[in-house]
Design a protein with these regions (language model features):
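A short alpha->beta transition loop at the rim of the catalytic pocket in nucleotide-sugar-dependent
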Residues: 156-158, 180, 187
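Aromatic "clamp/platform" in nucleotide-sugar-dependent glycosyltransferases that forms part
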Residues: 165
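Short hydrophobic beta-strand element within catalytic cores of glycosyltransferases
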Residues: 182-185, 199-202
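A charged, aromatic-enriched C-terminal amphipathic alpha-helix characteristic of glycosyltransferases
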Residues: 225-229, 233, 243-271
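Donor nucleotide-sugar binding/catalytic pocket of nucleotide-sugar-dependent glycosyltransferases
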Residues: 1-46
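C-terminal "capping" alpha-helix adjacent to the active site of nucleotide-linked donor transferases
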Residues: 206-247
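Short alpha-helical segment that forms part of, or immediately flanks, the ligand-binding pocket
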Residues: 149, 174-178, 182, 189-193
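Conserved catalytic-core segment of nucleotide-activated headgroup transferases in glycan assembly
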Residues: 30-147
């Protein structure tokens, strides 16, 4: 129906559009010729060398997503809050894991990289009285799809981490699962089409109104709500995964097989 809003706020029907052909909605498929488990020979690349040179730790959480505008906990991918929780989870910890952020702000420029580092450092500065903190590394710049697959398959990358407020689908999360990479993320929104609580690690939280400063018409409008991850549960799930990653890796392999069959481009064709 076509509706028109009146001065008093009421909506009046002004017409209608009738469809004379059926509509089918396809799911978003993953290119499983690219996003799949890779062997050691397939991992040989400049990217692998660069990451291994940059990141010395052998246990690394990976995040892939754009660092959008907003204050602490307001960017849609929730990266600033995620960084703070990671630091808190493993502060003063012997042999801590690392966090690798594949992120950027508006673009891939030198200025953007500096601003991204500044926003990460702002969270680190909250722990000025802590003796030791885990390392956070920034991977800033454009990667090819083949390089992204290599990144998900690197042995030291143990899990994909996201504290997102909401996703239309969550493509990087889906692609990571197809590479058999365990996923730790919020248990709400589009990513639940291909994740579950048994074969992935889901973070608890609650729906809250989108901050007024983040309203983005016509994408995010009032009175929209999005998912806010519980900070305590983020910390618990990070520590839980660190202790149980071998068992959770086994579950991720099961999910990877399911998603490569169910969410591939070939499966889209059958729809």
């Amino acid at each position: 129906d076509q509706m028109q809003e009146q001065p008093d706020g009421k909506k009046v029907k002004t017409g209608s559009i009738k469809l004379d052909r059926p509509i089918s909605v396809l799911f978003e498929g993953v290119d499983t010729d690219i996003y799949k488990p890779l062997d050691k020979n397939q991992l040989k690349s400049n990217l692998a060398d660069e990451v291994n040179e940059l990141v010395k730790e052998e246990f690394v959480y990976l995040h892939v997503g754009q660092l959008g505008k907003g204050g602490y906990g307001e960017d849609r991918k929730n990266i600033t809050l995620m960084v703070k929780c990671f630091l808190q989870a493993f502060s003063n910890t012997p042999n801590p894991p690392a966090l690798l952020l594949k992120t950027n702000g508006a673009n891939f420029s030198v200025l953007d990289r500096a601003e991204t580092l500044k926003r990460i450092k702002k969270q680190k500065d909250k722990f000025s009285e802590v003796d030791t903190l885990p390392n956070i590394y920034l991977l800033h710049g454009d990667l090819t799809v083949d390089e992204m697959s290599i990144l998900y398959n690197l042995p030291k990358i143990k899990a994909m981490l996201s504290c997102t407020h909401g996703e239309g689908f969550g493509r990087p999360l889906a692609e990571a699962t197809c590479c058999d990479l365990p996923v730790i993320t919020t248990g709400w929104s589009g990513q639940m089409d291909f994740l579950n609580g048994k074969q992935s690690t889901l973070i608890e939280g609650e729906l809250k109104p989108v901050p007024k400063g983040m309203i983005w018409k016509p994408i995010l409008v009032e009175p929209s709500k999005w998912f806010c991850a519980d900070e305590g549960d983020i910390i618990r799930k990070l520590r839980f995964f660190k202790k149980n990653h071998k068992k959770l890796k086994h579950q991720a392999k099961i999910l990877g097989q399911v998603n490569r069959n169910k969410h591939s481009l070939d499966a889209m064709k059958k729809e």
